[in-house]
């Protein structure tokens, strides 16, 4: 008799994706982050569902309802902080996952990579709308500043902003629709992640060498299931330490003040995971230019495949490219730091230089050493 996991229509799909899936024998811990992102997504949906049971998307009661969750709901505080810090873990895993894809040339899987970029945009949109929901000072002013950027679009900009707001300013209508979108988007992300996985399994996983591993595959279970569980335990440990010991470490104190349209905070800034993009946006004095640079900073990932000039897929054996990759990482960390600083000297010029360097490394400097490395192969 055939095993049920190989014959049952539904079990067969799960079996081919997570159990009998042929996987390269040499994939390192950098390949753990896909499964960690799946765990983060499940955690966010579950905690978000319980938060939605008690939250009210009305400007007069939103802030109070979040306070009520933390004070009066059984274990409401841990659900709230798991959700808030879970988003930070989500983005840490996401950035490492994208970085690994850039380092090892995973962008050569065109469909998988492009859907990944769409996923990145969707997750960023979801996180932004989630940040607005507690209706604190930073929620309100963050929403006002970021939605206002759309007014830079020629001709239709102002109408578009008022359409998104549902009025002439960020108000009840904005909060209600942001809550609706914040609720539905994680399910769209789940669907996109399934398609992402579907395309990945069409080609099979990449590996650190960047060389085809078809002749040396091992079953996903038990080898990589155990490895993924270990990674998940590490991630949960870090998340729980953050939630139980320092839940507000990554938040903004301004968000503990109810939203007040008449009082602007001294420094308006988004959550830490958007600071690099925010720094790029601020570094250009022109509004439309800033918006275009902001979008380009993420959309540039789609060009990675076209900018690949090396004969080798992975950076594993390309020291010059490795140096540039780590320069890019350092530059993004610098941008994150700048995004959290006030708009004054010397931060303005540092931000502008770091923004130029960011695009310069990806568009110009990275393709160049690849050509040198190709010539070195002939020696």
From Swiss-Prot:
Cofactor list: heme b
Membrane topology (UniProt): Multi-pass membrane protein
Binding site for a ubiquinone: 201
Binding of heme b b566, residues: 97, 196
GO terms classed as biological process: mitochondrial electron transport, ubiquinol to cytochrome c
CDD domains, alphabetized: cytochrome_b_C, Cytochrome_b_N
Main location: mitochondrion
Cofactor binding: number and manner: Binds 2 heme b groups non-covalently.
Record-linked InterPro entries: Cyt_b/b6_C, Cyt_b/b6_C_sf, Cyt_b/b6_N, Cytb/b6-like_sf, Cytochrome_b, Cytochrome_b_C_euk/bac, Cytochrome_b_N_euk/bac, Di-haem_cyt_TM
Transmembrane segments: 33-53, 77-98, 113-133, 178-198, 226-246, 288-308, 320-340, 347-367
UniProt entry keywords in alphabetical sequence: Electron transport, Heme, Iron, Membrane, Metal-binding, Mitochondrion, Mitochondrion inner membrane, Respiratory chain, Transmembrane, Transmembrane helix, Transport, Ubiquinone
Gene Ontology CC terms, in alphabetical order: mitochondrial inner membrane; respiratory chain complex III
Compartments it resides in: Mitochondrion inner membrane
Record Pfam families: Cytochrom_B_C, Cytochrome_B
Residues binding heme b b562, per UniProt: 83, 182
Other facts noted in the record for this chain: Heme 1 (or BL or b562) is low-potential and absorbs at about 562 nm, and heme 2 (or BH or b566) is high-potential and absorbs at about 566 nm.
Family, as annotated: Belongs to the cytochrome b family.
Function in brief: Component of the ubiquinol-cytochrome c reductase complex (complex III or cytochrome b-c1 complex) that is part of the mitochondrial respiratory chain. The b-c1 complex mediates electron transfer from ubiquinol to cytochrome c. Contributes to the generation of a proton gradient across the mitochondrial membrane that is then used for ATP synthesis.
Annotated protein name in UniProt: Cytochrome b
Origin species: Sus cebifrons (Visayan warty pig)
Upper lineage: Eukaryota, Metazoa, Chordata, Craniata, Vertebrata
Gene: MT-CYB
């Amino acid at each position: 008799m055939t095993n049920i996991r190989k014959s049952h229509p539904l079990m067969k799909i799960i079996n081919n994706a997570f159990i009998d899936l042929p996987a390269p024998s040499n994939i390192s811990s950098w390949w753990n982050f896909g499964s960690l992102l799946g765990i983060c997504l499940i955690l966010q949906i579950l905690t978000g569902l319980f938060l939605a049971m008690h939250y009210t998307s009305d400007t007069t009661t939103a802030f109070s309802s979040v306070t009520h969750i933390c004070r009066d709901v059984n274990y409401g505080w841990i659900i709230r902080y798991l959700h808030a810090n879970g988003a930070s873990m989500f983005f840490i895993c996401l950035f490492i996952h994208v970085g690994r894809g850039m380092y090892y040339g995973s962008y050569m899987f065109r469909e998988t990579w492009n859907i990944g970029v769409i996923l990145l945009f969707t997750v960023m949109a979801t996180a932004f709308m989630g940040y607005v929901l507690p209706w604190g000072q930073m929620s309100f002013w963050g929403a006002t500043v970021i939605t206002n950027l759309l007014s830079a679009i020629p001709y239709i900009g102002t109408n578009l902003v008022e359409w998104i707001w549902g009025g002439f300013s960020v108000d009840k209508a904005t909060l209600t629709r942001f809550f609706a979108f914040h609720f539905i988007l994680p399910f769209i992300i789940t669907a996109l992640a399934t398609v992402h996985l579907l395309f990945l399994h069409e080609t099979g996983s990449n590996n650190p060498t960047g060389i085809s591993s078809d002749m040396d595959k091992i079953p996903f279970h038990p080898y990589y299931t155990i490895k993924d569980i270990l990674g998940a335990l590490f991630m949960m440990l870090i998340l729980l330490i953050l939630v139980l010991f320092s839940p507000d470490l990554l938040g903004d104190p301004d968000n503990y003040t109810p939203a007040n349209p008449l009082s602007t905070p001294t420094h308006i800034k988004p959550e830490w995971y958007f600071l690099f993009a925010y720094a790029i946006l601020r570094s250009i004095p022109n509004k439309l230019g800033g918006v275009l640079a902001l979008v380009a900073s993420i959309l540039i990932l789609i060009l990675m495949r076209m900018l690949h000039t090396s004969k080798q897929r992975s950076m594993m054996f390309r020291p010059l490219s490795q140096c540039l990759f780590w320069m890019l990482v350092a530059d993004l960390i610098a941008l994150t730091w700048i995004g959290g600083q006030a708009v004054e000297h010397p931060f303005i010029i540092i931000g502008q230089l770091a923004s130029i360097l960011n695009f310069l490394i990806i568009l110009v400097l990275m393709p160049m050493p690849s050509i040198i490395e190709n010539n070195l192969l002939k020696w």
